[in-house]
C-alpha cells in the first residue's frame, strides 16, 4: 500500500541532526500581524496586500480569509502523509518530510509571487494556527528576497473575531430590513446605495437567490457556492468590516 511504502521510505531516511522548526526560523526576522491588523490594512488598501493562505487546497476551499490566495505549503496528500508520520512514527521524521515537500515548491512559489505582482505588495501569510506552515512558507518567501509577515494565531484567530462579533447582544448596528417579492429589484436597490450607505446583502453572502431561484444565477456565472455556515458567516463579516460606509455613515 502507499502507506507501507511511505513508512519504508521514512525508515530508510537518516533524520538525525535535523534542527527543530523553531531553530530554523529563528534566523529569520519575520513580522507578526494580528487578524485585526490585517483587516484594517485590507480596508485601507487591499490592492497593496497579497494575503497568502498556506493551508491545503481542501481547507482553503471550505473557507478562508477575505481577499486571500492559496499556496498550499503542503497539499492534501502531503498533509495527510505528514500527519500520518507524525502520529505513527516520529515528530522529527514528520518535520523532515514536510520540509522536503515544501522545498520542492520553491520554483512554483517564485512564479506564484511574480504572477501576483508581489514586488509592489505587502505579503502576509497565514495557516490554521499561525504555526509551522505559515512560518515555513514565510521562510521560503524570505529566501526569494521578499519580506513577508505572518498572521499570529492563524485562521483560528480570525474565526474568533467573527464568532465574537456575531455573539454580541445587542447587534452593534441598527438595521433596516428591505423586503419585497422575488424580482422586485431589492438587490439592484442595495447595489445603488452601497457606495454611500452601509449594506448587508444576505443573498450574496449565501450565494443564494431566494427560495425561487436558489443558486441558479450564481451557477450560470460560475460563482463558487458557499460551502458551509462558517463561510457564510465569514462573508457577512467581510461585508461589514471591509466596508468603510459602516463606519462613516451608519444609520442610527
Identify the residue ranges that each predicted region occupies.
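Positively charged, proline/Ser/Thr-rich regional signature most characteristic
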Residues: 42-117
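A short glycine-rich beta-strand->turn/loop micro-motif centered on a GG-aromatic cluster
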Residues: 145-160, 204-206
Amino acid at each position: 500500500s502507499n502507506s507501507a511504502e511511505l513508512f519504508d521510505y521514512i525508515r530508510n531516511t537518516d533524520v538525525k541532526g535535523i534542527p527543530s522548526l523553531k531553530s530554523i526560523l529563528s534566523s529569520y526576522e519575520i513580522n507578526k500581524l494580528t487578524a485585526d491588523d490585517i483587516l484594517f490594512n485590507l480596508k485601507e488598501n487591499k490592492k497593496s496586500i497579497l494575503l497568502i493562505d498556506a493551508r491545503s487546497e481542501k481547507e482553503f476551499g471550505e473557507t478562508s480569509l477575505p481577499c486571500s490566495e492559496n499556496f498550499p505549503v503542503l497539499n492534501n496528500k502531503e498533509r495527510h502523509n505528514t500527519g500520518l508520520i507524525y502520529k505513527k512514527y516520529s515528530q522529527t521524521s514528520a518535520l523532515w518530510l514536510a520540509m522536503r515537500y515544501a522545498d520542492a515548491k520553491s520554483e512554483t512559489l517564485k512564479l506564484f509571487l511574480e504572477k501576483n505582482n508581489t514586488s509592489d505588495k505587502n505579503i502576509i501569510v497565514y495557516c490554521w494556527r499561525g504555526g509551522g506552515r505559515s512560518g515555513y512558507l514565510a521562510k521560503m518567501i524570505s529566501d526569494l528576497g521578499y519580506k513577508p509577515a505572518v498572521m499570529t494565531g492563524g485562521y483560528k484567530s480570525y474565526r474568533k473575531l467573527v464568532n465574537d462579533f456575531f455573539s454580541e447582544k445587542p447587534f452593534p448596528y441598527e438595521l433596516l430590513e428591505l423586503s419585497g417579492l422575488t424580482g422586485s429589484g431589492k438587490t439592484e436597490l442595495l447595489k445603488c446605495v452601497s457606495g454611500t450607505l452601509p449594506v448587508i446583502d444576505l443573498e450574496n453572502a449565501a450565494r443564494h437567490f431566494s427560495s425561487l431561484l436558489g443558486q441558479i444565477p450564481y451557477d450560470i456565472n460560475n460563482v463558487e457556492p458557499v460551502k458551509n455556515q462558517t463561510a457564510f458567516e465569514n462573508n457577512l463579516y467581510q461585508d461589514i468590516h471591509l466596508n468603510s460606509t459602516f463606519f462613516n455613515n451608519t444609520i442610527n
